[in-house]
A protein has these predicted regions:
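Receiver (REC) domain active-site loop signature in two-component systems and cognate sites
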Residues: 58
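Non-catalytic signal-transmission and effector/linker regions of two-component phosphorelay proteins
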Residues: 1-8, 13
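Conserved sequence signature across two-component system core domains
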Residues: 10-11, 33, 52
Length: 60
């Protein structure tokens, strides 16, 4: 069985993060960050993030 790829979703709006997960479905494992600082921390703690989707206009 293949390992699910890991996607980090970075957006300050929870609604947007939820919509992305709904669109992409159960094919992937998800990590979520609500700002850039949290995303940087998560990248350091989680080896093997395959893709990062991020909002380019966030307060932090």
């Amino acid at each position: 069985m293949d390992k699910k790829q890991k996607i980090l979703i970075v957006d300050d709006a929870k609604f947007n993060r939820d919509i992305l997960k709904e669109i992409l479905g159960d094919t992937y494992n998800y990590l979520e960050a609500e700002n850039g600082n949290q995303a940087i921390q998560m990248i350091g703690e989680n080896i093997g993030i395959d893709l990062m989707l991020l909002d380019i206009n966030m307060p932090q």
